[in-house]
Design a protein with these regions (language model features):
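Helix N-cap motif at beta-to-alpha junctions
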Residues: 232-239
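Acidic, Ser/Thr/Pro-rich beta/coil linker or hinge segments at domain junctions
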Residues: 168-172, 245-274
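Short, compositionally biased
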Residues: 151-168
Length: 274
């Protein structure tokens, strides 16, 4: 068990284990977005930083087929931040909130040595999509194209530059695809830690393994911060799922099926390194 899973296991209860905690039709989710851990201010504008901080949190709501309604922001700002940079941050938060019809209802601000952001999203759902629910011989698929986020991160780490529309900066969420497909999906989650690592979470939740029908390179499958959807569904619904992908203009790649076997994650955890 890696250190992240070990720590989470200390608080194990029925609400922990999904992208958010589901309680009476309400989904509560929270993620951190810290300078020098998730980003550097030389990589992105303050506006882009705020946008991404909101989007990675809204992604958790969408992954559970929930409608985000409210946000609480905690922002630790460096003491030398300027008013114009503060305005950029505020505009980034507000523009994403407006796009997804989310009301920012409060939070906290403190002075810090660097820029650290945590966001709590409160969402509602009538048909939650959870990680638990898939069965043996179900199909496994992901949306979009994965692997580019890690490549662009590598460029930034090596003092290179990336396109302004890079997936590392501009996250595309799959709310329409999830909404129209939810009735057919047996389980799902967003790809935040990388395909192989998030498959490990599905395997653990459902006590299954996977038989791959497509070869996926380790460099692509270990790419984190993709925020595409990882889903499973009955093979009898394959045509219906393809129709829904076309309807929502979403690329859907079916790459495996679930089997009764132990799954081994080939990627190293990037949360805790020794």
């Amino acid at each position: 068990m890696n250190l992240e899973n070990y720590f989470i296991s200390q608080f194990s209860n029925t609400h922990i284990g999904d992208d958010g905690a589901l309680i009476d039709g309400v989904v509560y989710s929270k993620d951190a977005f810290f300078e020098n851990v998730h980003f550097k201010t030389s990589w992105m504008s303050y506006y882009q930083i705020a946008q991404k901080a909101m989007l990675v949190n809204i992604s958790d709501a969408i992954a559970m087929n929930a409608q985000p309604k409210y946000a609480l922001l905690s922002v630790a700002m460096p003491s030398d931040i300027s008013k114009s940079q503060m305005q950029e941050l505020a505009n980034g938060f507000k523009d994403i909130a407006k796009k997804y019809k989310v009301e920012i209802i409060g939070g906290d601000t403190i002075s810090n040595t660097k820029l650290d952001i945590t966001v709590t999203i409160v969402s509602i759902t009538t048909k939650p999509l959870k990680r638990v629910g898939t069965k043996e011989n179900y199909l496994v698929a992901h949306t979009g194209k994965i692997g580019k986020s890690k490549k662009d991160l590598s460029k930034l780490m090596n003092l290179g530059s990336i396109h302004k529309k890079s997936k590392f900066v501009n996250i595309e969420l799959r709310e329409k695809f999830v909404s129209i497909s939810s009735r057919l999906l047996s389980s799902g989650m967003d790809i935040s830690d990388g395909l192989f690592s998030d498959l490990e979470k599905l395997a653990s939740a459902n006590k299954i393994g996977f038989k791959f029908s497509k070869k996926i390179s380790k460099s692509i499958a270990c790419s984190g911060e993709e925020y595409e959807m990882l889903v499973t569904f009955d093979k009898r619904d394959k045509k219906a799922m393809i129709r829904r992908a076309i309807q929502s203009r979403t690329k859907l790649t079916i790459f495996a099926k679930t089997i009764r076997n132990k799954y081994i994650n080939r990627c190293k955890s990037h949360h805790f390194k020794r």
